[in-house]
C-alpha cells in the first residue's frame, strides 16, 4: 500500500460515515427514519436526494446495508436492507436491475430499500417503471447546513478536542474550502494531527498545511 493510500485509509477510518457523526441540521426527520431502518423497521422504500456534499452518500453508507460488490445488489434471501446510491447515473442495464430489486423487496415485507440521487424523482432520467417504484415510499430532500450551522458544529467538535478555531481561521475556511461538513471535519482532523505531532497550538499556517497534505493525497484540490 502506498503512503498516500494509507493516508486516505486512515483519514476514512477517522471520519467513517455513521448516523452518530451526521450533523442533521434541518434533516432531523430523515435521521429518525434512518434509525428505524437500521433497526429493521420503518418504511419499506425511501429515496433521498440532494447535491454533492449535503450528506446523501453519508446517510446511505451509515446504514451498513447488504452489498455484493455490484452497482445494484441482487436480492438475497436473509438480507433485509439494501441501498443504491447515485441512481441518476445508472445505465439501462443497472436501471433494469434496480427495477428487479424493487419488485423483490416489495414481495418481502421484512425487506427495505433505500436509494439516493441528486435530483427529485420526477427529474430523474430513468425508465418510468423505476421512477414510479422509487415513489412507492418516502422521499426526502436533504437540506444543506447553512454557514452558521456548519461553523457552530465545527467549533463544537474543535472544543471537544481542546482546539480553538480563531475568527481568522474560520474566515479562511469559509472562503477557501468547500462548504460540506465532511471536508471541513477532514481538514480539522488533519490539522489537529499536525498540531499534536509538533506540540503546537493550531494556527492558520498549520490549517493551510493540512489542506495541502489532503490535496496531495487525493491527487487534486480540496478547495
Model-inferred region functions:
Residues 164-177:
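Short conserved motifs of the RecA-like P-loop NTPase core
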Residues 42-59:
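Walker A/P-loop nucleotide-binding motif
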Residues 177-191:
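The conserved phosphate-sensing helix
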Residues 122, 137-149:
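Conserved AAA+ ATPase "SRH/arginine-finger" region at the nucleotide-binding site
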Residues 133, 137, 151-164:
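Conserved AAA+ ATPase "sensor/coupling" helix adjacent to the nucleotide-binding pocket
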Residues 1-36, 196-223:
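A short, basic N-terminal segment
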Residues 72-97, 101-104, 112-119:
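Conserved P-loop NTPase "ATPase switch" module shared by AAA+ and STAND
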Residues 121-135:
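Short regulatory helix/loop adjacent to the ATP-binding pocket of P-loop NTPases
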Amino acid at each position: 500500500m502506498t503512503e498516500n493510500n494509507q493516508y486516505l485509509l486512515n483519514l476514512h477510518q477517522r471520519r467513517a460515515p455513521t448516523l452518530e457523526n451526521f450533523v442533521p441540521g434541518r434533516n432531523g426527520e430523515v435521521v429518525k427514519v434512518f434509525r428505524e431502518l437500521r433497526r429493521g423497521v420503518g418504511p419499506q422504500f425511501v429515496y433521498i436526494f440532494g447535491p454533492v456534499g449535503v450528506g446523501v452518500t453519508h446517510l446511505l453508507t451509515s446504514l451498513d446495508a447488504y452489498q455484493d460488490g455490484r452497482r445494484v445488489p441482487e436480492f438475497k434471501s436473509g438480507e433485509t436492507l439494501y441501498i443504491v446510491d447515485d441512481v441518476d447515473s445508472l445505465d439501462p442495464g443497472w436501471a433494469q436491475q434496480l427495477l428487479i430489486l424493487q419488485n423483490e423487496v416489495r414481495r418481502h415485507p421484512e425487506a427495505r430499500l433505500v436509494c439516493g440521487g441528486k435530483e427529485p424523482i420526477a427529474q430523474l432520467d430513468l425508465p418510468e417503471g423505476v421512477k414510479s417504484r422509487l415513489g412507492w415510499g418516502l422521499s426526502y430532500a436533504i437540506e444543506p447546513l447553512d454557514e452558521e450551522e456548519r461553523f457552530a458544529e465545527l467549533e463544537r467538535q474543535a472544543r471537544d478536542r481542546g482546539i480553538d478555531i480563531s475568527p481568522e481561521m474560520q474566515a479562511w475556511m469559509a472562503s477557501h474550502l468547500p462548504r460540506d461538513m465532511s471536508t471541513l471535519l477532514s481538514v480539522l482532523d488533519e490539522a489537529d494531527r499536525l498540531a499534536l505531532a509538533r506540540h503546537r497550538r493550531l494556527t492558520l499556517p498549520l490549517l493551510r498545511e493540512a489542506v495541502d497534505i489532503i490535496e496531495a493525497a487525493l491527487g487534486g484540490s480540496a478547495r
